[in-house]
Regions:
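Solvent-exposed, flexible loop/coil residues
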Residues: 22, 49, 93
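Conserved ATP-binding N-box helix of the HATPase_c
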Residues: 38-63
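Bergerat-fold GHKL ATPase/HATPase_c domain
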Residues: 1-45
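Conserved beta-strand-loop-beta-strand hairpin that lines the nucleotide-binding pocket
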Residues: 1-13, 55-140
Length: 140
């Protein structure tokens, strides 16, 4: 099966790929360089969470495996496609609920908080069918 990720046309996409690492400062700087200044801090936090998950959980911090980020900053939105070489991910929490008590996973859970952070920062948070590519979009 071939999984296609539809991308907007007439869009200038940038791409960065890097070996699995948790040293993300320069990569994050590049990815937020053209993001509106009032968004930069929260977008940086969200992208850091997503990139750490891709490198650590997806690629198991294997330096032979890369994380690929395609990104575009458009007039009315910014979007990032983050792809890892892992076995895939199935989201277990849906943090899109308006009930504040349901936004976070159980206090004893070791996973799920990052997902909630992503849903708070970005307007669209979607995985491809294989669970190896995450699309994050923030609308202006």
């Amino acid at each position: 099966m071939i999984a296609l990720s539809p991308r907007p046309t007439k869009c200038n996409w940038g791409t960065v790929s890097f070996a699995s690492t948790l040293y993300l400062g320069p990569i994050l700087d590049l990815l937020i360089a053209k993001v509106p200044p009032d968004w930069q801090a929260e977008v940086r936090l969200g992208l850091q969470e997503a990139l750490v998950n891709a490198a650590k959980h997806g690629n198991q911090l294997d330096p032979r495996k890369t994380v690929i980020v395609q990104y575009a900053v458009m007039a009315n939105y910014c979007t990032w496609l983050i792809t890892d070489k892992g076995a895939g991910f199935v989201p277990q929490y849906c943090c899109q609920n308006d009930d504040p008590n349901s936004l976070l996973p159980d206090e004893h859970s070791e996973n799920g908080r990052g997902m909630c952070i992503l849903h708070q920062i970005f307007d669209q948070v979607d995985w491809n069918e294989e669970g190896t590519q995450l699309r994050l979009t923030k609308n202006r």
